[in-house]
Swiss-Prot record:
Source organism of this protein record: Homo sapiens (Human)
Name of the protein this chain belongs to: Prostate and testis expressed protein 2
Bridged cysteine pairs (disulfide): C31-C57, C34-C42, C49-C80, C84-C101
Gene Ontology cellular-component annotations: extracellular space
Signal peptide: 1-26
Keyword Iron-sulfur: no
Keywords: Disulfide bond, Secreted, Signal
Family to which the UniProt record says this protein belongs: Belongs to the PATE family.
Record localization: Secreted
Positions of the UPAR/Ly6 domain: 29-110
Expression (tissue specificity): Isoform 1 and isoform 2 are expressed in prostate and testis. Isoform 2 is expressed in male and female brain at equivalent levels, in particular in cerebellum, cerebral cortex, corpus callosum, occipital, parrietal and temporal lobes, and pons, but not in amygdala, cerebral peduncle, hippocampus and thalamus.
Length: 113
């Protein structure tokens, strides 16, 4: 009887039996990482990264500029980036759009691309 009481007490006091939980890790934001992402597919290996101090999830959308000056979507790069800011870079042959987010897990998946 005493053994059952002790076992019950151990199971009540140790709800995460065999696992160590860090309360900070439970609130980490996760992001996708892919060097070349296009139309819902990662050409390579899709991995995850967790945000560290001053980091955000980032999507870099690469566009090719046509002779008429229009942008044609080419591919995206997904990553965790330090000191990330939303910005557009415009060159003679390409445009790069950088979009940053840190509001939810895996928020850096491009929509409508």
């Amino acid at each position: 009887m005493l053994v059952l009481f002790l076992l019950g007490t151990v199971f009540l006091l140790c709800p995460y039996w065999g696992e160590l939980h860090d309360p900070i890790k439970a609130t980490e934001i996760m992001c996708y990482e892919c060097k070349k992402y296009h139309l819902g597919l990662c050409y390579g290996v899709m991995t995850s990264c967790s945000l560290k101090h001053k980091q955000s999830c980032a999507v870099e959308n690469f566009y090719i500029l046509t002779r008429k000056g229009q942008s044609m979507y080419h591919y995206s790069k997904l990553s965790c980036m330090t000191s990330c800011e939303d910005i557009n870079f415009l060159g003679f042959t390409k445009r790069v759009e950088l979009i940053c987010c840190d509001h939810s897990n895996y928020c850096n998946l491009p929509e409508g691309v």
